[in-house]
């Protein structure tokens, strides 16, 4: 509970001193890290800030259906306008036991490029698309690729998306 309060305080302080962005990472089963429900915490932070961009650094896309991520971040954009950033990564963001509890399989990360494209189409639908993400449809939510390898950087370049390099995950 204290970490949740501190996340708001840090975001407010960052806003007051002139930072442009405040992002939260998705992590599971880690004491002291309270951003397991990243979009929920971002909604809370958005309600307590007014100008700073808030976003995910990042949502581990293989843990979620792209439709649900688009709906959540579309809702955030509907509430907070162009203050929302959506960073996505392909790592599990957790340990092996929690990986299994999230119902992930080893193949989930292999689908990351297709999942990113599906996610992008929920914000900018194709003409023949049958599933529409409400309220994401037509909203400008910048999608960032997060990574620590050439794979992520290459994918971002191929899709014309911004890339955020994680220096702490490079060995």
Range-by-range predicted roles:
Residues 42-50, 77-81, 157:
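Acidic (Asp/Glu)-rich catalytic clusters
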Residues 1, 127-134:
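N-terminal small/glycine-rich loop or linker at the start of catalytic domains
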Residues 22-24, 54-56, 84-88, 143-146, ...:
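Hydrophobic faces of well-ordered beta-strands that scaffold small-molecule active sites
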